[in-house]
Design a protein with these regions (language model features):
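Acidic donor-binding segment of Leloir-type glycosyltransferases
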Residues: 1-4
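C-terminal catalytic/acceptor-binding lobe
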Residues: 114-191
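Active-site nucleotide-sugar/metal-binding loop of Leloir-type enzymes
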Residues: 15-26
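A short, glycine-/small-residue-rich helix N-cap motif at loop->alpha-helix starts
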Residues: 6-14
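Short, high-confidence coil segments that cap the C-terminus of an alpha-helix
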Residues: 24, 51-54, 137
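Short beta-strand-to-loop acidic/aromatic patch adjacent to the donor-nucleotide binding site
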Residues: 24-35
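Conserved catalytic core of nucleotide-sugar-dependent glycosyltransferases
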Residues: 18, 35-114
C-alpha cells in the first residue's frame, strides 16, 4: 500500500493522482465513507476480464431526458430503469459501489485540474462520465443476483456531511452537468 499526498482536489483526490501515475493500469475507485463486502473487487475485476472494453460499476443510474431531449434534474435519474445487462450511453456510474476504469477509457483532459475545478469542482462522477463519453467508452453495471446494498454499507457518522448531499440539495450536480457537457459539446451524443 502506498499513501500519496496531493493538492486538495476534493472528491477528485481518489482518482486524479492515480491516473497520472498509473495511466497504463486498471484503476478501481471506491468511496471512503462506505464499508464494502469482500466480493466487491472480485465482481469488478471478473467483469473487466470478461469484457475489458467497458467501464464497470456496481451502483448507478441512467441519465434522464424529457420528451424534447432536454436533460432532467439529476435527482430524477434514479427514477429511470437501469438494466444491468444493457449497455447504454446514458448509464451513469456512481462511486458508492465501486467503479473500474480500464486503461485509456477516459479522455486525456481527465487530469486537467484547472478545467475540472472550474467546470465541476464538487462533481467528480459527472466529470468522469463526460470523459468516458468524450473517449467513446461505454459504462456497464455489473449484474448481481442480489441488491448492491448488501455489498456495502454507509458509515453514518460521515454520511451526514457527505459531498453528495451538497451536490443534490444545492443542485450542484445539475450545474456541473450543464457546464461540462456544454463545454465539450457532449449533448450531440444523445441525439
Amino acid at each position: 500500500m502506498e499513501i500519496a499526498y496531493c493538492p486538495d482536489y476534493r472528491s477528485y483526490k481518489k482518482i486524479i493522482p492515480t491516473l497520472r501515475k498509473y495511466s497504463e493500469d486498471v484503476i478501481i475507485t471506491i468511496d471512503d465513507d462506505v464499508l464494502y463486502g469482500h466480493e466487491t473487487l472480485e465482481y469488478l475485476i471478473n467483469a473487466y476480464l470478461q469484457e475489458p472494453e467497458y467501464i464497470w460499476f456496481m451502483s448507478g443510474s441512467k441519465m434522464a431526458f424529457d420528451k424534447n431531449g432536454n436533460i432532467k434534474p439529476y435527482v430524477t435519474w434514479y427514477d429511470e430503469h437501469l438494466t444491468a445487462l444493457e449497455c447504454n450511453i446514458k448509464n451513469f456510474p456512481t462511486g458508492i459501489g465501486g467503479i473500474l476504469y480500464p486503461p485509456h477509457s477516459l479522455a486525456e483532459e481527465v487530469t486537467d485540474e484547472t478545467l475540472f475545478m472550474k467546470l465541476a469542482p464538487t462533481a467528480d462522477d459527472i466529470w468522469l462520465k463526460a470523459m468516458s463519453l468524450k473517449q467513446g467508452t461505454n459504462c456497464r453495471q455489473i449484474k448481481l443476483n442480489k441488491p448492491v446494498m448488501r455489498f456495502h454499507t454507509g458509515i453514518k457518522e460521515v454520511q451526514t456531511s457527505a459531498l453528495c448531499k451538497d451536490n443534490i440539495e444545492k443542485n450542484l450536480n445539475d450545474k456541473a452537468v450543464h457546464a461540462v457537457f456544454d463545454y465539450f459539446d457532449l449533448w450531440k451524443l444523445f441525439n
